[in-house]
Amino acid sequence: MISCSEEGSNKILVAISLDRDESQNVLSWAINVLAKPSDTVVALHLLVGEEPRKLPMKKKKRTQIRHAKAHVISMLGEFAYTCCHNQVNLEAKVGFSSNIGRGLIDEVKSISAHYLVLSRPTTHEFRIWNDIKRYVSDFAPSSCSVVLVGNQRKPHKDCYSDSAISLDINSEKYSPRSVLNTLSRDSLSSSGDDASSFNGSMVSSSFASPSDKPKHKSISPYKFISSLIMNSPLRKWRGSETKNKPKPQPLIQCFTYNEISKATNDFHQGNIVGIGGYSEVYRGDLWDGRRIAVKRLAKESGDMNKEKEFLTELGIISHVSHPNTALLLGCCVEKGLYLVFRFSENGTLYSALHENENGSLDWPVRYKIAVGVARGLHYLHKRCNHRIIHRDIKSSNVLLGPDYEPQITDFGLAKWLPNKWTHHAVIPVEGTFGYLAPESLMQGTIDEKTDIYAFGILLLEIITGRRPVNPTQKHILLWAKPAMETGNTSELVDPKLQDKYDDQQMNKLVLTASHCVQQSPILRPTMTQVLELLTNGNEAEIAKSWRMPKDMTNDDDDNNEWDDYSMIFGYDVPSDSSF
């Protein structure tokens, strides 16, 4: 047993098979997503047959048990660190049963489990799986919820019951309809508590029988995306203000391919203003004089996950409206996938800090950008109908408007986090090196504190004018740490400012950054507290109650976990590399 806390408040029984990948996935989901601190996860592997009662056992039976125990123990060993970090207890069990379903229910009753987690098999016979699922759904105690995780198949007509929660990972290829259909369902729920994603797949929750499920007519992606946009909570809220008008116009336009092609001069290479991992951004001019930026999914991108990210960005950003988030004008689904934004003449924060040959940003503009990004993140975390975790806050994802008002952009990695969830697990790790929080890099867990860590790095970038990672220099955090510990703010200031800055504002930014970049997520402030720090500095309540956190004052650089980045990747990496 791996124990890191007191007796668990919930017991989670996880049935694991001899399929290692399948078992790793279901255990990872149970530990990182379902379990909360003090919960106990019990990994159970059942051998088919009667439990041997005669001693000594036959050699074949002993070997079978030994192999099963070794398999289960080795599986648990891989999650030891994660369980200790999450304060989750982990136990292993091997049992016998002539009927797998009955064996699972017996164990549920034996340990008084609150959850029974099953993984849909990828290689086993689905008839047996359906029999097991039907049995546990029928006989699970009312105090135990049955959670099914795995590849979605056509549901059996008897597979649904009031005591079962079905979490189906959709394995079909992503398309505008399949991804946006999920996004549309999520957007119309009030809390989002029943939907998320695991291992890069779509996860849904179902409590109804198949007959109760709505039937979707076949519609074109163009019409479907239009309905998604018009049905978003943002559109409903704005529409309520004009409900007396005969026919409100959509706030997001569905462009035709001819319109955006003409605007960008047939996507001429001279109009490219940015190239990302899966997309290209073109400058264009519409017939009515509006200057736009058209984000196009790269033609050579055959990765369905990239298409999913593109569509996820559409689904999320169509629900976002704030002065400090990018304004989506519309989209196009003809001859590819396109997002249309208002063009930002001043480019990105990254280009302004690191590539502007005509001069650097002066201090009032930098301070304005820092506060604006904080307000945008506060909106995403606290003010949206859903909690939105951006997951890729960095200087190249901050656009600068006409008056250098910052706007957070690129929601391709963003997640809607259900209100009742404390964190979320994402496999594989995604984001931009240099901004990734330690818990995200090491364990794949994300929440609001992941964004707050990245925001702290962004503040240091604004203050110092240094890139987070440079092939010839230390990571910006390792470089800045001594000055933050001693309070020598002047050592951090970008030389390009030539000492032309407001001391009080600078101290507020350094103070805020020092709290945001703590290794432990618990020590980091919320975005509400971040705004208070930026406004009131040392007079903020959180500043009065906090001093320089202990994990900022470790002088043993050889053992300091701040150096996790250098231990894993070294410093000789691209300055803006994305996973």
UniProtKB/Swiss-Prot annotation:
Residues of the active site: D392
Catalytic activity: L-seryl-[protein] + ATP = O-phospho-L-seryl-[protein] + ADP + H(+); L-threonyl-[protein] + ATP = O-phospho-L-threonyl-[protein] + ADP + H(+)
Entries under Gene3D superfamilies matching the protein: HUPs, Phosphorylase Kinase, domain 1, Transferase(Phosphotransferase) domain 1
CDD domains: USP-like
Binding residue positions for ATP: V273, G274, I275, G276, G277, Y278, S279, E280, V281, K295
Protein's UniProt keywords contain Oxidoreductase: no
InterPro entries on file: Kinase-like_dom_sf, Prot_kinase_dom, Protein_kinase_ATP_BS, RBK1/2/STUNTED, Rossmann-like_a/b/a_fold, Ser/Thr_kinase_AS
Keyword annotations from UniProtKB, A to Z: ATP-binding, Kinase, Nucleotide-binding, Phosphoprotein, Serine/threonine-protein kinase, Transferase
Classification via Pfam families: Pkinase
Protein kinase domain location: 267-542
Any one GO molecular-function label of the UniProt entry: protein serine kinase activity
Protein's name in the database: Probable receptor-like serine/threonine-protein kinase At5g57670
